Amino acid sequence: MLPKELVRFKELGNQITILTAWDSLSSAIVEAAGADVVLVGDSLAMFIHGHTTTLPVTLEQMLHHTQAVGRGFLSPKNKQPLVVCDLPFLSYQCGEDKAVAAAGTLLKNSCAAAVKIEGAEPEVISVIERLIRMGIPVMGHLGLTPQSVNNLGYHRQAEDALGQEKLVTQALKIEQVGCFSVVLEHVPSKVASKVTQMLKIPVIGIGAGEECDGQVRVTADLLGLTDKQPPFAKPLIDGRSLFIESLTSWVDQLRN
């Protein structure tokens, strides 16, 4: 699937489904589940590498995991989900040339067909414009942006009128410069719905209500694999307990 094809989903009113994967095992499962898009998220810093934020993950680690994701797909190339990879912290904030090099490294050496970038500050917008001119598709990300945790924390964003006006302005700018879609994270459903109606490009929600053009979730959150989930990502099963019980049963059988 090409990034621009997601616009057709919006035109037809078809919900876009995005799940994370970080290795070949998870990508095979997510592909089998029928997700439209696989996001190799920098959240792997926390879920895989044990960090408390996304900030420590490196470009080399993102490349390593995206390559592993590509090896897990079983469908023919033209039937595989679209793969979007997060550009990690400080891979694009330090200038356009560094951003092009980072995104180019991912697209040249892995299955990624697009990158995701957080924010819409003037410097970030310039980077996005440059990447798109270079032929690199970009997904935007607004609202709660985890790479800005030291400034924003993990609180819900755009709760007052000023914040909502800013979010709308940023979303319009993201569309104007050529992003093929935008993620809205942890914002009120009312403003997310407004943005969804205003934009021609797909708006993907996570903790942004049900009226977006699609939803993205961290696979480990949906499967209940951690002992703590964000309030907007209710687990479908208690996978952690299921795994522990199954493995405990095996250990006990051997010991007894």
Curated annotation (Swiss-Prot):
Ligand binding (3-methyl-2-oxobutanoate): D42, S43, D86, K116
Enzyme class (EC, first level): transferase
Coiled coil: none
GO BP: pantothenate biosynthetic process
Catalytic activity: 3-methyl-2-oxobutanoate + (6R)-5,10-methylene-5,6,7,8-tetrahydrofolate + H2O = 2-dehydropantoate + (6S)-5,6,7,8-tetrahydrofolate
Cofactor note: Binds 1 Mg(2+) ion per subunit.
GO molecular function, one term: 3-methyl-2-oxobutanoate hydroxymethyltransferase activity
Cofactor: Mg(2+)
HAMAP family: PanB
Assembly with partners or alone: Homodecamer; pentamer of dimers.
Protein name, entry field: 3-methyl-2-oxobutanoate hydroxymethyltransferase
Species in which this protein is naturally found: Prochlorococcus marinus (strain SARG / CCMP1375 / SS120)
